Amino acid sequence: MKYDTFLLQAQIWRKIGHLSHAGCLLAFAVLFPFFTWLLHFSYTRLERRRGKEKPEFAWKSWQQWLLAGGILYGCYLLLLIACYPGFYNYDIGNQLPQIMYPEVPFTAHHPLLHTIVGGGIITIGYHLRSVDLTFGVFLYNVVQMAVCASCFSYAVVFLYRKTGNRILAVLSELFYILCPPVVMFAMSTTKDVTCYAFLLVAVLKIYQIYADLNAQKFPTVRQWITTGILLCLACLLRNNIVYVLPFAAAFAVFCTSCRRKQQILFWIVMILAPFVLNKGLMAAVDAAPGSAAEALSVPFQQIARVYVDKGEAAFTQEELDYLYTCINKEDFAMYDPVIADAIKTAFWRHLDVIMADKGKAI
């Protein structure tokens, strides 16, 4: 599998990473308002449909969810059998030994929750059928597809109950069944899949909470707790999700005055809970902390891009002397504008130099 979709392979998107400063500003000036308008249009249209929301449905919401989820899961299982055992890819190869072999220490380099759960399921499958990892990978994908089907069908039912539009609901269901990247990633052993499945439902729950607040209704404790659990799961499955929470909190509290104290309490808990829970997991399995290189992948990639585009002329001699202690000069040839892994690894080899004088590195 590739990181690229057919859309990202288009040359127009490839060139964005090589734009001049003015070009970047122009791209931002065009794309940011467009996507902001698109989100605003979608949510305001959904809000207008609330007046057409049916007070009664022939089926209860959980029955609709079971039907949509059952159809989706059945289709996913057929596709998984056709592609048996699914895709064993990305970071799970580094995570699995931590579960399978006692002599391999745990590390928080990758999300521990995914290491424990994902590695545990594959290990169980391996012990059930000890020929190779095939059955374990299949078992993992069976579980992951159940999570995806549950979350995606919740989104379909949410949309249907908000709009009452059966055609829109059917098209949404077909999208989750027929869109190749969605189906392929649903059977891929990567943390991103379950993370964004939980995040999808969390976003819909947050939408419902703030729609109620704007209508001067009071969300129940159950709504807050359910949303919090989903957000925590997303954060524990993908470390960088937590970075957006302070910005989301500030924006939400600033724009919505109703029950502001309740909002502030919720967002404070949400910012702290993933950190505390992750520390608890690290203590429970005696895991070593993750590398700081993970958090620095964006500036590493930016430095490499400037070096590749403009060469040594873009740096002073003092900067170059220090830069070559942080990364081997020939490693800049590994720069890829699409993914930062190669450059991140090159800097990671000399991370002790960077961490020894953080001020100079900054």
Regions found by a protein language model. Give the residues of each.
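Membrane-proximal stem/loop segments at transmembrane-domain junctions that anchor or position
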Residues: 287-362
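Transmembrane signal-anchor helices characteristic of membrane glycosylation enzymes that use polyprenol
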Residues: 1-2, 31-36, 60-88, 272-283
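Membrane-interface alpha helices of multi-pass inner-membrane proteins
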Residues: 223-238, 249-250, 270-275
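Start-transfer (signal-anchor) and selected internal transmembrane alpha helices
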Residues: 17-76
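Extracytoplasmic catalytic/substrate-binding loops of multi-pass membrane glycan-assembly enzymes
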Residues: 83-97, 104-121, 127-135
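Specific aromatic-rich, kink-prone transmembrane helix
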Residues: 100, 154, 194-214, 231
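Transmembrane-helix motifs of polytopic, lipid-linked glycan transferases
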Residues: 33, 142-163, 201
